[in-house]
Amino acid sequence: MLARAARGTGALLLRGSLLASGRAPRRASSGLPRNTVVLFVPQQEAWVVERMGRFHRILEPGLNILIPVLDRIRYVQSLKEIVINVPEQSAVTLDNVTLQIDGVLYLRIMDPYKASYGVEDPEYAVTQLAQTTMRSELGKLSLDKVFRERESLNASIVDAINQAADCWGIRCLRYEIKDIHVPPRVKESMQMQVEAERRKRATVLESEGTRESAINVAEGKKQAQILASEAEKAEQINQAAGEASAVLAKAKAKAEAIRILAAALTQHNGDAAASLTVAEQYVSAFSKLAKDSNTILLPSNPGDVTSMVAQAMGVYGALTKAPVPGTPDSLSSGSSRDVQGTDASLDEELDRVKMS
């Protein structure tokens, strides 16, 4: 068993060295197991047996018995997943940029018969197919898309390999691009492009920040003006309501005063009290005219207060003698002579005040 393992390891090392050199390997028959009649096939391996030079059967893992001399183990295929490094190669993109690119290929033998008789060396064939497919797919893409669409590029290479390798009994599980090397000048231009893009983004972000700041300031001023106008409106409404309440209160107070005055006039000596009030207001009016106005209205004898009071009493007496229009007394009298006499006396009294 140790001898068989050593022979298998030597065969794999030989195959790997041939793949790295880029030459198609030739299968060495010296590393194959010998027919010892009773054979034990390891797990995940398939041994292809030929009988008298023709394919006979495939030995499955476990105990197997062969006929000496007639049966011969011709191929040993591993059913495990195989990892192959695809050598670095040059490829030209759609925009005429030369790249150095390599990758890793993951495959598995699905049909040992096709892998043994369909191609001389399936692993080498798949490696060459991966290289040519990668060059073909890179020629369809620009340099920017090669970096942006690595996953789609890997999927395209896997699909192309599976279509061609189906007759070889091999299935490509996945393909991964390892490194992409660009020329120094292209790398410098890409770096400049990245820096320009960053400056552009910074400028755009700065302008957006300035715009948002201006919008926020304008919105704040707008809200401040709206609040100020609403406050002024509320103040005016409150002021108007206060003034209306004050006017109403004054009117009610004045009406109450008039009612009280009217009630007082109907009492005993009410006329005398009214005459005294009129005289006081008469004298106060002359005092205000003398203080607040440039036009001075003086009575005939300003030093005689008694005469001023007498004049005021005369005006009040003339007013009290005149009937009030619409009252029952004025309507029932029907005498125009009394009204004319009252008007005449009132006019005479006013003329006398003016003359004095």
Swiss-Prot record:
Positions carrying Phosphotyrosine are: Y124
Which sequence ranges form a coiled-coil region, renumbered to this chain? 215-252
Q: Which Gene3D superfamilies match?
A: Band 7 domain
Q: What residues bear Phosphothreonine in this entry?
A: T327
InterPro entries per UniProt: Band7/mec-2_domain, Band_7, Band_7/SPFH_dom_sf, STML2-like_C, Stomatin_HflK_fam
Q: Which UniProt keywords apply?
A: Acetylation, Cell membrane, Coiled coil, Cytoplasm, Cytoskeleton, Lipid-binding, Lipoprotein, Membrane, Mitochondrion, Mitochondrion inner membrane, Phosphoprotein, Transit peptide
As one GO molecular function, the record gives:
cardiolipin binding
What Pfam family does this protein match (any one)?
A: Band_7
Membrane topology, as annotated:
Peripheral membrane protein; Lipid-anchor
Q: Where in this protein does the record say Phosphoserine is found?
A: S17, S330
Positions of post-translational N6-succinyllysine modification: K145
Q: Where is the transit peptide?
A: 1-28
Q: Where in the cell is it found?
A: Cell membrane; Mitochondrion; Mitochondrion inner membrane; Mitochondrion intermembrane space
Report residue spans for region: Disordered.
321-356
Q: Name one GO cellular component term.
A: mitochondrial inner membrane
Keyword Cell inner membrane among UniProt keywords: no
User: Could you describe the post-translational modifications of this protein?
Assistant: Hyperphosphorylated at Ser-17 in some patients with monoclonal gammopathy of undetermined significance (MGUS), multiple myeloma (MM) and Waldenstrom macroglobulinemia due to impaired dephosphorylation by PP2A.
Tell me where on the tree of life, at the top rank, the source sits: Eukaryota
Q: Which family does it belong to?
A: Belongs to the band 7/mec-2 family.
Q: What else is known?
A: Paratarg-7/STOML2 is a frequent autoantigenic target in monoclonal gammopathy of undetermined significance (MGUS), multiple myeloma (MM) and Waldenstrom macroglobulinemia, 3 B-cell neoplasms associated with excessive secretion of a single monoclonal gammaglobulin (also named paraprotein) in the blood.
The name on file for this protein is: Stomatin-like protein 2, mitochondrial
Organism annotation:
Homo sapiens
Lineage, opening ranks = Eukaryota, Metazoa, Chordata, Craniata, Vertebrata
- Gene symbol of the encoding locus: STOML2
